[in-house]
Amino acid sequence: MNQLLSKSFKPLVVAGVAVIGISAFSGNRAYDEYRKERESISKKMINDLNENKITMFDYFQECKTLGRDEQLSKLNKLSKVYNKQKLNEQENQEELIDLDLIVIGGGATGTGVALDAQSRGMKVALFEKYDFSSGTSSKSTKLVHGGIRYLESAIMKLKPSELTLVKEALRERSNLLNNAPHLSRQLPIVIPAYSIFDASKFWIGCKLYDFFYPFNDIPKSYLQTSAQTYKEFPFLREGLVSSVVYYDGQHNDSRMNVSLALTAAQQGALTLNYTEVVELIKDDKINNNNKQQQLKGVVIRDRLTGKKYSVPAKCVVNATGPYCDSIRNLDDPRADPIITASSGVHIMLPGNLIPSDKGFLNPKTKDGRVLFILPFEGKTLVGTTDDPSPIIENPQPLEKDVEFILDSIKEYSNPNVKLDKSQVLACWSGIRPLVSDEPAAQGDNKKSTSQVTRSHSLRMSESGLITIVGGKWTTYRSMAEATVNLVCSKHDIFTPKGCITKNLPLIGGEKYYNTLNQYLIKNFNLPEDIAEHLAHSYGDQAPFVAKLANENGSNKRLVEGYPYIEAEVTYGVKKEYACTAEDIIGRRTRLSFLDHDKAEIALPKIINIMAPLLKWSNERKKEELKNSQNYLKTMTSK
């Protein structure tokens, strides 16, 4: 008993008693009317659809957005040849400005800001230097979570800010799962306990996690016997006492990011990838007592054609994640850095290590971290590391990081489990944009990045540049809402509507239903794995991908062993702004994340499909192959 009531454990015991004492007040969640309506999508209509009493066009609505060339044409009309004298002498400068907001950065946060602002009635343009989700947002652990380890930090180290972060993330977890049900799912995660002390500690911690989200749309945590745990996870070493199972969410991060960009475009925003901001446009208006020119727009360069556009706007938001300081330095060369960068390495293993519907958490690795082992797209995703990192483009995992992850799995594995680098199908490194009041020098190993807060930071410069940075995937929507609120208040922008993104379905989510894959099998004669993949990747747009596949005979697989088909390449170019083969293997499909070697095999076929659509010459095709192979090098360790 003394051990259980040790000093380090007392906060958890007290908190656990509190949870048990007041859990009766949590009650059942009264689902809001919107969610009720979404979950009861015309059962009769779905039955009629499945029985072919109505056509797909009576139920599904194809997403309509401007193509990239159409968006550039519209941008050209908006673009003004910047003349400093004319801008300063204009009696009504607002007449020169057609856009309310420019967003720099096409990751989760940037596309979230663009969608929030455009859906309120603002006129928005978003510019991304590379592809949507090409940076940090595609390289996550794929979890939609409150952050159970941050809860431990909040309680054990008495950090109220961490508790606030957990509560916000738990609320946003539900919003994300509801708005993109095809791209996300609830996922039970098992925490193994090798002592009664650990079992008690983990159980109380998970019950606290439940308490801070006292609604019934996410199942509650529970204790599980060692026998059941061994049955599900036979790789575990002997000595298990029990395990605790808690619930979080999982999503396809890149597909989610692309859906955000498409939804913003459907709302009317200009969402352009491969457009780099090379200059900030300013006038000579003095902001109060600060001798700082006011920001009035940006100059962008189309990286595919080299053409430049000067684009005025009332406000500019910097949402470039770990690269935000470079934009801040464009605005003010004196600006101090605010980013403490951290690298997060993940590896992909074959799918036979854990169940397809349950994850595993190593609660404490040998250096005090946590490690997730998760099912993802038929494989096993393992990660992550958390080390200081230089801020570079296209980071590559280090051999030592891959070995660390493999060793961390072995800590909980029985001797019969053989794991080595030869089984790693792919690996990647993402850079977390952590915000620190006292940023460490990049690569400074004396500062533990795992101790830097995951909260976001929102700030405005003297020129009016608004920077949003930090946070995590799960809280992208609330971060975007806070950003647009600041845009409206600081730049006096009136919007006819308030924020509606809490209940705004993303492209593919509005009319998705759980048996859509069966409809695809029956009506398009698709193999089961391909139908399942299309339903979960495209949601209610999947029938249009399947229809395209049947019409032009592009229902063949891109590579054996995976459900990706040729029609997805055409669809990605025509409907999802894919401009390179890398976009296809990395972000429209997830092939490069699942299997580096198979992605390389698929490249020639993908390039041959894209070439006539994008008018590539033979020389351009060779260049594309080389560029894509260079990208694939970042999906292996060095």
Curated annotation (Swiss-Prot):
Keyword Mitochondrion in record: yes
Keywords from the UniProt entry: FAD, Flavoprotein, Mitochondrion, Oxidoreductase, Transit peptide
Enzyme class: oxidoreductase
Keyword Mitochondrion: yes
Listed cofactors: FAD
InterPro entries (alphabetical): DAO_C, DAO_C_sf, FAD-dep_OxRdtase, FAD/NAD-bd_sf, G3P_DH_FAD-dep
Gene Ontology cellular-component terms listed: mitochondrion
Chief subcellular location: mitochondrion
Annotated catalysed reactions: a quinone + sn-glycerol 3-phosphate = dihydroxyacetone phosphate + a quinol
Pathway: Polyol metabolism; glycerol degradation via glycerol kinase pathway; glycerone phosphate from sn-glycerol 3-phosphate (anaerobic route): step 1/1
Enzyme Commission identifier(s): 1.1.5.3
Pfam family, one: DAO_C
GO biological process, one term: glycerol-3-phosphate shuttle
Residues annotated to bind FAD: 100-128
Family as reported in the entry's similarity comment: Belongs to the FAD-dependent glycerol-3-phosphate dehydrogenase family.
Protein known as: Probable glycerol-3-phosphate dehydrogenase, mitochondrial
